Amino acid sequence: MTEVISNKITAKDGATSLKDIDDKRWVWISDPETAFTKAWIKEDLPDKKYVVRYNNSRDEKIVGEDEIDPVNPAKFDRVNDMAELTYLNEPAVTYNLEQRYLSDQIYTYSGLFLVAVNPYCGLPIYTKDIIQLYKDKTQERKLPHVFAIADLAYNNLLENKENQSILVTGESGAGKTENTKRIIQYLAAIASSTTVGSSQVEEQIIKTNPVLESFGNARTVRNNNSSRFGKFIKVEFSLSGEISNAAIEWYLLEKSRVVHQNEFERNYHVFYQLLSGADTALKNKLLLTDNCNDYRYLKDSVHIIDGVDDKEEFKTLLAAFKTLGFDDKENFDLFNILSIILHMGNIDVGADRSGIARLLNPDEIDKLCHLLGVSPELFSQNLVRPRIKAGHEWVISARSQTQVISSIEALAKAIYERNFGWLVKRLNTSLNHSNAQSYFIGILDIAGFEIFEKNSFEQLCINYTNEKLQQFFNHHMFVLEQEEYMKEEIVWDFIDFGHDLQPTIDLIEKANPIGILSCLDEECVMPKATDATFTSKLDALWRNKSLKYKPFKFADQGFILTHYAADVPYSTEGWLEKNTDPLNENVAKLLAQSTNKHVATLFSDYQETETKTVRGRTKKGLFRTVAQRHKEQLNQLMNQFNSTQPHFIRCIVPNEEKKMHTFNRPLVLGQLRCNGVLEGIRITRAGFPNRLPFNDFRVRYEIMAHLPTGTYVESRRASVMILEELKIDEASYRIGVSKIFFKAGVLAELEERRVATLQRLMTMLQTRIRGFLQRKIFQKRLKDIQAIKLLQANLQVYNEFRTFPWAKLFFNLRPLLSSTQNDKQLKKRDAEIIELKYELKKQQNSKSEVERDLVETNNSLTAVENLLTTERAIALDKEEILRRTQERLANIEDSFSETKQQNENLQRESASLKQINNELESELLEKTSKVETLLSEQNELKEKLSLEEKDLLDTKGELESLRENNATVLSEKAEFNEQCKSLQETIVTKDAELDKLTKYISDYKTEIQEMRLTNQKMNEKSIQQEGSLSESLKRVKKLERENSTLISDVSILKQQKEELSVLKGVQELTINNLEEKVNYLEADVKQLPKLKKELESLNDKDQLYQLQATKNKELEAKVKECLNNIKSLTKELENKEEKCQNLSDASLKYIELQEIHENLLLKVSDLENYKKKYEGLQLDLEGLKDVDTNFQELSKKHRDLTFNHESLLRQSASYKEKLSLASSENKDLSNKVSSLTKQVNELSPKASKVPELERKITNLMHEYSQLGKTFEDEKRKALIASRDNEELRSLKSELESKRKLEVEYQKVLEEVKTTRSLRSEVTLLRNKVADHESIRSKLSEVEMKLVDTRKELNSALDSCKKREAEIHRLKEHRPSGKENNIPAVKTTEPVLKNIPQRKTIFDLQQRNANQALYENLKRDYDRLNLEKHNLEKQVNELKGAEVSPQPTGQSLQHVNLAHAIELKALKDQINSEKAKMFSVQVQYEKREQELQKRIASLEKVNKDSLIDVRALRDRIASLEDELRAA
């Protein structure tokens, strides 16, 4: 390491070594406080380690080779370009910037871009002398300065005829705005012209800075003059290099600052400048005071900034307004808006006891409305109790206190933002002076990267913009540069600097997968969406899927995003409101009608939406969120940058305390790392930043070489010959395919040599020209001498000739001859001059017109291009949404087909399992018969066993001992309960269940044979019978416990199924919401083919109705069979109880207990089967009623089949969801089969006896029946859900039809208005032709006809009222009385037929009455459905009250009696409820048919009314013709 450092220090590029000055070897080492510090190597250690001593200290430290960096020689201190440093490392770059900063040299070159450090003080480096200095110097001799970058951009624009851009970037408080001002100052100075108009443009461009700073800048924690908006200033230049125009584009105004400011910050400067600098007259006119504490939006902020006089700044603002051409009215309008905002913040809002808001200070409202130019009453009403549209009606909504306060704040922010936009537009109007073709230099000044204690939506947009700008810088500096090296095929190794910011940008803006802004836009249009739902949705999308995204500790409060500068925590509170930018439309419309023209102009878009209506509807534009608008503006800005040659200025914050001559090394080093400064220096030193095409290089520098003149030399070869002749080092340039690439500084050296060559050549040229001119002067003098001599000779001859008489005559006549010819020539020339002037003027006018047309076409073209880009962006968004929905639809259809196939397989399996179940039931019946034969045999043994009564007492003692052993059995029960809980997690599949049942049947047969053998042995061995009795009692108790546990397990499974059904409903809702979007997009395309499918679905539903009817009858028969079985079971239980009382023998008691146990099991299983069948019967009845109602509604709404297709799609989706759930249940069943078989194998040694096997068989059969029934129930629920969705779609279609009828009704009303206007014309005609009696008679006849039609209409209305009364009577009476009222309803139908066919305009009232009657009938229909639902609910409650008793094992006789009593009561209740249900169903069907007939008749009446309207139009037209004829 010693040799390496010494070599680096002594031999690098021939640099002067530190040893020439100092014998110490100086290095940089890291320091926790100052980032790095100087030290010198005291001793070399083995393993490449060193002992170093700190500078100005005796502290020593052992460091490794990787922990030190060499220090540059002293001659490189405060170097102008950091690319010239010998050792390029982070401490060296930071130290160079620090040394220059402390010596007030705030600008430093960093390769191809400029680094500017904020001095936090004024420096005399922007004067006119400095501007002239940089204007006169060549590029190589220019010291680092912002003027140098501006001059480079200007020269490139003139030489290359290419648009330029200067990106001033950096963190907040780094001095971006100040550097932007200096760039504009320099461009205005060097591009100035002698003409008055051009100088005025330059002055106006400079004066825009104080205006924009006053209205758009504010004090923040890090900057006293922070730009709270982004601006892109385009300075346009003519072809001659003079400033012709300027334009300003603005982005992301922080309008929330108007109403809220953080601690130690303040509002926009203009508020404080107005209160401090305005005179008394203006304040009185604006109703303002001098104190900032009088206004709520200012009193909590910092009022004064050190070193800034708001009063003087206000004078500067007024002077800028005057220079920019603002008149007094425009100035007053701007200040009036500021006063409006201040008064708006002083409105006090309270609430009454009911929570409704009320305004507490009417005086402040009067002031505000006076400034706004609106009525105080209307303003207060629209603010506190606005009118909102609920459906098709306008209602008054009472607002709460918080709603009114937020509405006021939103209005204040909107007014300030709109006023700022108007101000920028007005500035652009003042700066637009020429329409000629030009190039521009764009200067970007936008808010820097921001990290506050609480970062919201505004900070995300600002940081997203800076992320894009930083990516553009990295792409231009590192990627494009090296890509061009590769494209030109020069020798270069690609360097990856690791600055790929695309993952963070994709996380913010990408549409698929959905990013932050797209997710926010989706949540803004979702109903009942909140900030918490947005955050949770975003967390579900990106958690653990992107390294750039991290959740908050509390996930619903925000998230953390990794930017290029740092990790930023964002709080999502209020993001939905900020993105939608809500505004009280009632107040906005009121302001659009304001008497204050400026206020009305700001809200002119609400005035346009009020006037542009079509058929009574407001025509609104496409809704765009704040995120969408910002993303579009940012994309347009980046497109402009990509079409220009960029120049970069990286601004650096030296300290966070805003102190001069204070340099925080860790802070600056972090910014250098983030901004890519070090990488830019490295690529500048290693690469070839300057390049020229071969032809340009030859044209520019061939003057310095001697190329062959006789033959043609190709440009590439000529360029190489020039470089060889100029003796340029080959390592300093590379020859590409079409260009020559140079190291930094080489092209500047060539330029200097070219200038020297030109100077030498120009000197030679000057000498030759001067010699030529002197020779010309000498020759002229010789000619003058010869002319003088000739004149002298001629004068002598003239003197002699003058005395000759004829000569006098000749001299007198000669002028007279030539004057006449001269006059003619002069007149001819004057005429030609006049004609030429006329033609010139004509051509100038035509030229101006062409230029004007060209400007208009260019403006229209730019407008069309902007519109096209926005439309393309919208189309891309819609295409992306459509593509996602199509992909989801395709996936849904695929899964639907799979689940459909699985459902068919399940149905086949369920059929086979049902058959197996029937076989098992038959075998069980055979078993019961065999048991009865055994009982008969055991009755014969009663006499033989009478002698063993004494032994019974001993067995009772054994029973008591068995009770003591019950504790041990309970432990076994706990183990069995745990096993049952494990069985609850999975459900038995149908295929595995078949194998298991067959296995149990075979085991059961063997056990029956063993039971027979044990019964035979029972007579021989009484001692063994006593032991078996004790064992049987244990088993009975154990089985009873197992029965109770299994019943509890069944209840738990039911609860789990209910929870699954709830989850299914939630999933169905989400799927329905997604499918609605797909259906709305495809509804217009698939209308015609859907009609056929809908008709087929109607036929299928009719068939389904018939199948349900037959199934209903079958279920009723099964119910009867179950009741008969219950009766037989109760009789058998009574018989067994008598036998149990007569038993005095242990063996007989064992047999009776076994029989009772079997009967109890059968009874429980029968009860469960009966309940399931009864529930299935109820579901079938409900399904039949739903099918009937749906069938009738669909037949009635046959004209709206297109809307029903969407319900069918939802039905298929829900059915698919059910099938997928069934498939998941199928998988769970298969898992349970495996677990059950495993458990059975484990329990087989314990359950080797007959009772245990019987109990398990019955339990398994019971579970099988439950599973089959649950599967059927799920299918029925799926059908019911599909029908409910279908009903929902039908109701939506009815709503659409009602809306269409309302539209037609509005049309008819318009026609009525036209007829009324015709009547007025008729009255005028009567006055004019009053003498004609025939017209009067005709009019009287028409009036008589109108009276007749009114009478007819009244009679029709009376009939409608009678119908309504009958309908109310139907609702009030019970079902028995409803049948008697049916004929009365039918008798009213001929009344409609008896109405005369002659119709008038008043038939419209009849049509409205019919419509009302139709709605009343619909309400009655819904009420009947509610009654039906209540009856069904009562039946379900009765059913739920039936709780089957559980045997305890202590008193079997009481349990059997209780079961018999409950079964009997249950039987009576079921019969009564069944009778009620059948009667209600019959009455419901009759009543439903009557209502449908009435609805059909009303529809006919509506059709007739439409026909009558058309006839009425024809009659009106005929009357008009008659009147015209008269």
From Swiss-Prot:
<dbReference type="InterPro" id="IPR001609">
    <property type="entry name" value="Myosin_head_motor_dom-like"/>
</dbReference>
<dbReference type="GO" id="GO:0031097">
    <property type="term" value="C:medial cortex"/>
</dbReference>
<dbReference type="GO" id="GO:0120105">
    <property type="term" value="C:mitotic actomyosin contractile ring, intermediate layer"/>
</dbReference>
<dbReference type="InterPro" id="IPR004009">
    <property type="entry name" value="Myosin_N"/>
</dbReference>
<dbReference type="GO" id="GO:0005737">
    <property type="term" value="C:cytoplasm"/>
</dbReference>
<feature type="modified residue" description="Phosphoserine">
    <location>
        <position position="1044"/>
    </location>
</feature>
<dbReference type="GO" id="GO:0032153">
    <property type="term" value="C:cell division site"/>
</dbReference>
<dbReference type="GO" id="GO:0110085">
    <property type="term" value="C:mitotic actomyosin contractile ring"/>
</dbReference>
<dbReference type="GO" id="GO:0005829">
    <property type="term" value="C:cytosol"/>
</dbReference>
<dbReference type="GO" id="GO:0000281">
    <property type="term" value="P:mitotic cytokinesis"/>
</dbReference>
<dbReference type="GO" id="GO:0016887">
    <property type="term" value="F:ATP hydrolysis activity"/>
</dbReference>
<dbReference type="GO" id="GO:0005634">
    <property type="term" value="C:nucleus"/>
</dbReference>
<dbReference type="Pfam" id="PF00063">
    <property type="entry name" value="Myosin_head"/>
</dbReference>
<dbReference type="GO" id="GO:0030863">
    <property type="term" value="C:cortical cytoskeleton"/>
</dbReference>
<keyword id="KW-0175">Coiled coil</keyword>
<keyword id="KW-0547">Nucleotide-binding</keyword>
<dbReference type="GO" id="GO:0120106">
    <property type="term" value="C:mitotic actomyosin contractile ring, distal actin filament layer"/>
</dbReference>
<dbReference type="GO" id="GO:1903475">
    <property type="term" value="P:mitotic actomyosin contractile ring assembly"/>
</dbReference>
<dbReference type="InterPro" id="IPR008989">
    <property type="entry name" value="Myosin_S1_N"/>
</dbReference>
<dbReference type="GO" id="GO:0032982">
    <property type="term" value="C:myosin filament"/>
</dbReference>
<dbReference type="GO" id="GO:0051015">
    <property type="term" value="F:actin filament binding"/>
</dbReference>
<keyword id="KW-0505">Motor protein</keyword>
<dbReference type="InterPro" id="IPR027417">
    <property type="entry name" value="P-loop_NTPase"/>
</dbReference>
<dbReference type="GO" id="GO:1902404">
    <property type="term" value="P:mitotic actomyosin contractile ring contraction"/>
</dbReference>
<feature type="region of interest" description="Actin-binding">
    <location>
        <begin position="634"/>
        <end position="656"/>
    </location>
</feature>
<dbReference type="GO" id="GO:0005516">
    <property type="term" value="F:calmodulin binding"/>
</dbReference>
<comment type="similarity">
    <text>Belongs to the TRAFAC class myosin-kinesin ATPase superfamily. Myosin family.</text>
</comment>
<dbReference type="GO" id="GO:0036391">
    <property type="term" value="C:medial cortex septin ring"/>
</dbReference>
<feature type="binding site">
    <location>
        <begin position="170"/>
        <end position="177"/>
    </location>
    <ligand>
        <name>ATP</name>
    </ligand>
</feature>
<dbReference type="GO" id="GO:0016460">
    <property type="term" value="C:myosin II complex"/>
</dbReference>
<feature type="domain" description="IQ">
    <location>
        <begin position="758"/>
        <end position="787"/>
    </location>
</feature>
<feature type="coiled-coil region">
    <location>
        <begin position="875"/>
        <end position="1244"/>
    </location>
</feature>
<keyword id="KW-0009">Actin-binding</keyword>
<dbReference type="GO" id="GO:0071341">
    <property type="term" value="C:medial cortical node"/>
</dbReference>
<feature type="domain" description="Myosin motor">
    <location>
        <begin position="77"/>
        <end position="755"/>
    </location>
</feature>
<dbReference type="GO" id="GO:0030899">
    <property type="term" value="F:calcium-dependent ATPase activity"/>
</dbReference>
<dbReference type="GO" id="GO:0120104">
    <property type="term" value="C:mitotic actomyosin contractile ring, proximal layer"/>
</dbReference>
<feature type="region of interest" description="Actin-binding">
    <location>
        <begin position="734"/>
        <end position="748"/>
    </location>
</feature>
<comment type="function">
    <text>Required for cell division. It is a component of the cdc12 'spot', a structure thought to mark the site of septation. May work in conjunction with myo3.</text>
</comment>
<dbReference type="Pfam" id="PF02736">
    <property type="entry name" value="Myosin_N"/>
</dbReference>
<protein>
    <recommendedName>
        <fullName>Myosin type-2 heavy chain 1</fullName>
    </recommendedName>
</protein>
<comment type="subunit">
    <text>Binds to cdc4 and rlc1.</text>
</comment>
